[in-house]
Structures are given as structure tokens and as C-alpha cells.
Amino acid sequence: MSVEKNTRQLEKDIVRDFSSRMSYASYLQLPTLLSAQQPVSNPEHHDEMLFIIQHQTTELWLKLVLHELRSAAAWLRSDDLGSALKAIARVKHIQKTLTEQWSVLATLTPTEYSQFRRFLGNSSGFQSSQYRAVEFVLGNKNRKMLPVFESDPEAYQQLSNVLEAPSIYDEFLAYLNRQGFDIPTSLLERDVTKAHQFCPELVPVFKHIYENAADNWGAYEACEELVDLEDNFQLWRFRHLRTVQRTIGMKAGTGGSSGAAFLQKALELTFFPELFAVRTEIGQ
């Protein structure tokens, strides 16, 4: 086959002059985006680019997760369950992408990482304000996390705002209450700046929804969507843990944590405990 025959000709109407038009690069601000990868190792280590891009893309996805979860919470407040579930469905797909993304970083061997890790100083994923905001939005509130971000006023304010706002679970329970379900008053009037604690009185409410799904389909579907969210989050946490274990073993984290041991404890945290507890009660 000749080169000429293996070439796609540009159609005559394809725009070529962008001197006064918005282009792909200008719309996405690619010069800014693609200049943000600045390795600090000296001499520059080949694999640091992977490390930087892995974390930068994670931050972009987390930005979208927050965008969708905030919208979902707002739609729940206005009783628009359909729109809320649509946003949550999108978040679930993002979560799967984030989880699979660990497989790329896992190609970084312990030897390779050790050759530039010392240049990272005390920077650590633990300091990701967006990750912390996602945990807060899902209900894992912890005011003691805020001091980590005092040197970044914008991030500190963002997290403070999320801490003070109801979580998506709080909004869902308030929605159910407005729909006539008997949600315990203690949950409707709780201090939303604190992590949700297991409430046994809520389990019978979910039991009724699950055992009468046909009559409560919207609530039933929402319950399952939230279960998916937590499952996906736990899978992400697990892949994070395993990637750390295979890369640095049981070394302490760059930010001062115990490393893998600290990540292991995160697997014990839960967002929607009653939605898992009800499974024991269904059919009994």
C-alpha cells in the first residue's frame, strides 16, 4: 500500500485557522495543564513522571466526584431523587476508574520508587483536601483532620464548609422522612459535623423498604446505589493499601503516618452501616 493511499485527507470544511477561534488546547487550557508536571528529583528520575501524573489525574477525578456528590445532595434536598441517582451513578463509574488506576502505579517497583522518594519531603496523599472532602461528603467527618490544611486557607475553608454541611446520607435520610418513612428524630437532628454512628432504630426502616421494594422502588434503588458507593470506596481503599504494601512494604509514610498500617485502619470505617446491617434482618 502506498503512503498516499494510507493517508486520510482533510475534509474541506475542517477548521484550520484558530487565530481568532477557540481551539481544543485553549478550551482545555492544555498549556497550563501539561506544564504542571514538574519532577523534583535530581537528577530527574524517569518514573517520577508516572508518580506525578497518577496523583494529578486522581485529583481531577476527585474534583468531578465532589461536583457530582454536591449536586446529588442538592437534588435530594429538593426531592429530585432521579437526578440525584443519576449523579451517583456517574460517581460509581469514576470510582471504578480510580480503582483500576492503581494498576498503573503498581508498575512502579520498590527499587524505582526508592530512588526518588526522598525528594518528596513530607508531601503525602493524606494531605489531599479533595479526598478528605469526599470522605466528609459521604459522612466520615473528623474535625481533627482540619489542622493538616491550615497552611492552605482555600482548602481549609472548603473542608470547613463540607464539615458543617449535611452528608449525602443525612440528606437521604431527610428525604426519606419527607416521603413518610419513620426516620429516628435523633438522626434528623444530629450534629452533622460528626461522623455518622450506627443507629439500630434505622434498620427496621430499611428492612421495610427492602422487603417491600415494589412499593418503595425509588427508596430501594437509592439504598442500593449508596451500597454501591461504599463498596466502590472500600475497593479503592484496598487497592491503595495493596499498592503501598507492594511498593514500600511497611515503611512509614512520607507524611508521618505508619504507612500501610494506617491505611489498613481505614478499611474499618463505614459510611452507611445500617444499609449493610439490614441484610442480616431481611427475610427474618
From Swiss-Prot:
Keywords: Dioxygenase, Heme, Iron, Metal-binding, Oxidoreductase, Tryptophan catabolism. Binds 1 heme group per subunit. It catalyses: L-tryptophan + O2 = N-formyl-L-kynurenine. It is an enzyme of class 1 (oxidoreductase). GO terms for molecular function: heme binding; metal ion binding; tryptophan 2,3-dioxygenase activity. Pathway: Amino-acid degradation; L-tryptophan degradation via kynurenine pathway; L-kynurenine from L-tryptophan: step 1/2. SUPFAM superfamilies: Indolic compounds 2,3-dioxygenase-like. GO terms for biological process: L-tryptophan catabolic process to acetyl-CoA; L-tryptophan catabolic process to kynurenine. Heme binds at residue 240. Gene3D superfamilies: 1.20.58.480. Its EC number is 1.13.11.11. It holds the Pfam family Trp_dioxygenase. Its cofactor is heme. Substrate binds at residues 51-55, 113, 117, 254. Homotetramer. Heme-dependent dioxygenase that catalyzes the oxidative cleavage of the L-tryptophan (L-Trp) pyrrole ring and converts L-tryptophan to N-formyl-L-kynurenine. Catalyzes the oxidative cleavage of the indole moiety. Belongs to the tryptophan 2,3-dioxygenase family. This is Tryptophan 2,3-dioxygenase. It comes from Arthrobacter sp. (strain FB24). The gene is kynA.
